[in-house]
Amino acid sequence: MAFFNQNICGVYLGSIKKTYLIILLLFFVLDVSVLGNTKDSITTSLEEFKEYKVDSSFGATSVNSATQLLTDHNEVSNGIYWVLMILFATILAGIFVHFKNLRQLRSLFLVTSIILLGFYRGGCPCPIQSFQNIFLMLLGQSIKWQSLIYFLALLPITYLFGRVFCGWVCHLGALQEFIFMTSDFKILQSKKAQKIMRIIRIFALLSLVIQLILTHSNLYKKIDPFTLIFNFQNPYLVGWFFVGLMILSSVFIYRPFCKTICPIGLILGWISKIPGASILGTNENCISCNICNNKCKIRAITHDNKMSGLENEECIRCGDCLTGCKKNAISFFHKTKRKQQ
């Protein structure tokens, strides 16, 4: 009977995922055929978080200057509105993940993120470009301070709730998740593979920072999948190569960009090491059944002969382990109150 129920549940979840994929495909077609004609009227992250350079004619009393100032003001206001909506959704997700019934809304969060932040907004705003603008400002570039809010605000939110942004709100992570089809690619699920992918992420972050220091410009936007995958008019062929590689690998690997490249996920993961940060861990109820390990697609949970351990740097707070554990052996803690397992 239990086996039958598991099969029914698996078929049900599979049908839900197919429904979401159909919805996303419809929006993809709509984005190409209809929204593509109006994309110029929508502020994309390439414009909103671009490097801001003051015009040499700044201060002139011409009508054109006044119009440009008004346009810039509207763009900034529009960008801040969307950033605040994203931050609110992230806080909401941080609360929802604590409750079993509300965790079921995660798929709705992800689909909404892809539709609004992806197909409607063209990948705007982009957290990576917000992160880059911090460095550009420190390097003396003239940057709109409003573009810094996105990344900086994610730091305290992650401290309070963990990486819920990655697991519930990020539109690129959501897209990879819905593309993912199979977990049979076992070679990339080992502890050694996880360590190698983390090292690759560190090198990617260092490369990004070095590029910013040497060039004082945002060259990464030419290959940034956060925006490129949702902006079909982008001319950068190298970027499209990486996007194609990401889409193909997402079929076999769970969130490959998140696991190997994304600097935002890496930095937000480091927040879990700060004393007082919200973390997940196993408690005394753990019977080493390995269910949570099997449920964890991001491979944040490791298992030995004694009990399971959770690596909060990798955990995206999807809640699958919390829902799957029948012994309530996984709980929320604070870094200062309990050592992470």
Regions found by a protein language model. Name each.
Residues 23-31:
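Bacterial N-terminal signal peptides
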Residues 3, 8-20, 32-304, 313, ...:
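Non-ligating segments of multi-cofactor redox enzymes
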